[in-house]
Amino acid sequence: VQAVESADLVLYDALVNEELLQYAKQAEIIFVGKRFGCHAYSQDQINDLIVSMAKSKGHVVRLKGGDPFVFGRGSEEIDFASQFGIETAVVPGISSPMGVPASNAISLTQRHIAESFWVITGKTSEHKLSKDVALASKSSATVVILMGMNKLDEIVALYQNNRTDDLPIAIIQNGTRPTQKKVIGTINSITALVEEHKLASPAIIIIGEVVENASKLTSYIEGEL
């Protein structure tokens, strides 16, 4: 909030909670979000904007959702700005692979159930499913996949080919927001559930026994299924 309040310019992403923009009372605000098939600006254009606006406006805030260093291009943007002698600082965020399961009482690690977890992108820079998903599917770890909705059929097929058990799986769309939607099923049932409840991006996919062992919360975010 302090950073946004003191900004001369705010460049914000598609997944940012826009309520934060109310604190930018003295700043020019530019949307630079990128969603599947729709880019307001390319990454190169965003990099150039950061530099040009820092030189002409002063204090630029690059407002991102979650953690800018988990599939967020944060390091790339800082490295680019640093080439031009622009001073940078970071306000850490909570990445959706941790924040969204926690808000739904899903513990990514649990004693005797899951000793570790993977966080994997569902879409590489070549628009292919990450090879790490195949490796993770053979482990006992909890697996969290971001940007994977368009690859859900491939993910399900990998698990069906690599395992004999029918693991629990949760898909949470618009996590932590009032518009959140959630379905819980298994590898064999999830595709039909997603179609039935019309889930789409942005959503995270959580695969593992911890999904079945989610704690019971005393309150829930509005909009859950």
Stretch-by-stretch model annotation:
Residues 67-139, 181-184:
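Class I SAM-dependent methyltransferase SAM-binding "motif I" and its flanking Rossmann-like core
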